[in-house]
Amino acid sequence: MGKQEVKTRQGERVAIVAGLRTPFARQSTEFSQVPAVDLGKMVVSDLLARTDIDPKLIEQVVFGQVVQMPEAPNIAREIVLGTGMNIHTDAYSVTRACATSFQSAVNVAESIMAGAIDIGIAGGADSSSVLPIGVSKKLAASLLALSKTKTLGQKLKVLSGLGLKDLMPVPPAVAEYSTGLSMGQTAEQMAKTHGITRAEQDALAHRSHTLASQAWRDGKIAGEVMTAFPEPYKKWIAEDNNIRHDSTLEGYAKLRPAFDRQYGSVTAANSTPLTDGAAAVLLMREGRAKELGMEILGYIRGYAFSAIGVESDMLMGPSYATSKVLQSTGLALSDLTLIDMHEAFAAQALANVKMFASDKFAQENLGRSKAMGEIDMDKFNVLGGSIAYGHPFAATGARMMTQTLRELKRRGGGLALNTACAAGGLGAAMILEVE
């Protein structure tokens, strides 16, 4: 495999100029009535205002939404139309489950590398509160048949075949389509397979909340989070509302397992909650950013995606994707100043941390002669992770990118890894650089 270079044909790098997100809110709280498309428009509009860039200069928007809304299937285009951009701005939507905004950022970066555009916006938004509630297959078929009837008798005949259970709403699926397993069940399997104890999971969750709380108190997060005024505009939200500012280890021990009631160790407290929110990043060709006098936050140095089986260890994507991106960039784990891994579950994150250091795993699964290396926990999720901040599926990648770049800048520059697992056995990894 040749060395990956995230550059244009003229050798210019892809710069991330700015990043912004809404506060992340637990399901059915401050954003309970705000659909994902409105969250997306909200954050992109504020991003454009903060960077003081003419919206007409944006040439492409790539945005993602995991929980699709039938009435707005192309969230990216709705954002263009709702934020004052040129109506001719290219816009399309992507989904890679929990790694969606890594994918959208890569798509914009590749458009810049190809010379198709100079400036683009990437990101994602999701609402776990405003959901598409479906109907049973029998009711759906009956409604379709009903639309084709002409007489009252025909209508009554169609309706007579429906029972009360057919009228029950069908909530969105929370399990893998191919296996029927939920993410939580997979996290339980990974905890058992890799010997991740309840105490270790609770300790990571406590660490995540403690570090996130401290980061907010130290003023490190506010600059990348907008103040949102959701309709009917009678209140606002300026901070994430999932973070436990009074987190104690003893508190986690009180919760019962959520997925294996008798023998399990994965609980609601050592997992990330269902969350509403949006995040976006502004990307530019390096030279164009300098022409416009924009301060550059950092650069994308490399990226990789992975796919593995879904029957077991489905959330091991970070280990596979990180191996690929380290190989393609010629870097070692020791070259990194920071490592930020998405915490879908403490069990999943800790299992991946364990596999990073496993020679056996590297030889059997990664095609490496030895492990990638032991993760220095002083570099790992230093501002807390998704367990604390929350996880609006499509927005998490952009949150991680912005948060990591700003922290790298505070530390005087360097290289950082962002990596995430995703449904379907997918994984994502990105190397970011700040000079």
Curated annotation (Swiss-Prot):
GO biological process annotation, one example: fatty acid beta-oxidation
Cell compartments where the protein resides: Cytoplasm
Keywords: Acyltransferase, Cytoplasm, Fatty acid metabolism, Lipid degradation, Lipid metabolism, Transferase
Highest taxon of source: Bacteria
GO cellular component terms given for this protein: cytosol
Primary role: Catalyzes the final step of fatty acid oxidation in which acetyl-CoA is released and the CoA ester of a fatty acid two carbons shorter is formed.
EC number: 2.3.1.16
InterPro entries referenced in this protein's UniProt entry, alphabetically: Ac-CoA_C-AcTrfase_FadI, Thiolase, Thiolase-like, Thiolase_C, Thiolase_CS, Thiolase_N
Pathway(s) it belongs to: Lipid metabolism; fatty acid beta-oxidation
Catalytic activity: an acyl-CoA + acetyl-CoA = a 3-oxoacyl-CoA + CoA
Major subcellular site: cytoplasm
Self-association state and partner proteins as the record states: Heterotetramer of two alpha chains (FadJ) and two beta chains (FadI).
Family affiliation: Belongs to the thiolase-like superfamily. Thiolase family.
Species per Swiss-Prot/TrEMBL record: Vibrio vulnificus (strain CMCP6)
GO molecular function annotations of the record: acetyl-CoA C-acyltransferase activity
Protein name as catalogued: 3-ketoacyl-CoA thiolase
Keyword presence, Phosphoprotein: no
Active site: 98, 391, 421
Signal sequence, start to end: none
Enzyme class, first EC level, given as a word: transferase
